[in-house]
A protein has these predicted regions:
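Intracellular juxtamembrane helix-capping segments at the cytosolic ends
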Residues: 159-173
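Loop-to-transmembrane helix entry/capping segments in MFS-fold secondary transporters
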Residues: 85-86, 174-184
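A membrane-interface helix-boundary motif in multi-pass transporters
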Residues: 1-4, 201-213
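Short amphipathic helix-loop junctions that connect adjacent transmembrane helices
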Residues: 71-88
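Juxtamembrane intracellular "pre-TM" segments in multi-pass secondary transporters
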Residues: 19-57
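Cytoplasmic membrane-interface "Motif A"-like loop-to-helix N-cap segments
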Residues: 112-125
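C-terminal ends and interior cores of transmembrane alpha-helices
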Residues: 124-141
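Helix-to-loop junctions at the C-terminal end of transmembrane segments
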Residues: 101-115, 203
Length: 213
């Protein structure tokens, strides 16, 4: 895996090099300073709007869990249940198809009951999914039960995509939509980083195993 990642890094350097002369002396630092100043201002405004801060903090955790589950699903079922490459392909296909189909249903549900109730229901489905993945290993349950996990995870992913952004839109005042959606996006990127990092620490450094991660 080292070579592909190294190639991607070199690609970033190569394609960004032509734009480097466009920056005058000090302009980069000025841009970074301005961005950090605006970020601090945006964060300080979060408490002015009820529920927004709690939602963004919560989003770190459920986005972290969802990203990590999808990123390491193939490794988990391969190492813990000995699935073959063909089995893993079928396993992932179940998740993809269930997320596509359920997405339409979640969209209708958001329109009917609102994004908050829908998102809470989605989080319970995520809880059921992770409980199934963990208990199948720790409690020695029949291995065939694991095939229900991609179905549930796909449904939960579809619901997350359908309810997450609309709920943010409900919590955000119209005049600050662009500003707070930048913070919303940053929270998602942060979760994308800490998810795999947490997995590596729990599995490799602490040796607690994949179910614990």
């Amino acid at each position: 895996f080292v070579l592909p990642f190294a190639a991607i890094a070199c690609g970033f350097v190569y394609f960004s090099t032509p734009s480097t002369p466009l920056f005058r002396d000090g302009s980069i630092m000025k841009a970074v300073s301005g961005t950090l100043k605006q970020l601090r201002k945006t964060i300080s405004m979060v408490d002015e709007f009820p529920g927004l801060g709690r939602f963004l903090v919560g989003r770190i955790f459920y986005t972290d869990s969802a990203n990590t589950a999808t990123a390491f699903a193939a490794i988990y079922v391969s190492e813990e249940f000995g699935m073959t490459t063909a089995d893993i392909a079928k396993y992932m296909l179940i998740g993809i198809l269930s997320s596509i189909v359920s997405g339409f249903l979640w969209g209708y549900l958001v329109d009917i009951v609102g994004p908050k109730i829908t998102l809470n229901l989605v989080l319970w489905i995520w809880f059921a999914t992770f409980s199934l993945l963990i208990s199948t290993v720790w409690l020695g349950l029949p291995a065939w039960l694991i095939w229900g996990a991609p179905f549930l995870a796909g449904i939960a992913l579809g619901g997350t995509w359908c309810a997450d952004r609309p709920y943010m839109l409900v919590l955000t005042p119209p005049r600050y939509i662009g500003q707070f959606y930048g913070l919303y996006s940053m929270v998602g990127r942060f979760a994308t980083i800490i998810g795999p990092l947490s997995w590596a620490i729990i599995v490799d450094e602490l040796g607690l195993g994949r179910p614990a991660a």
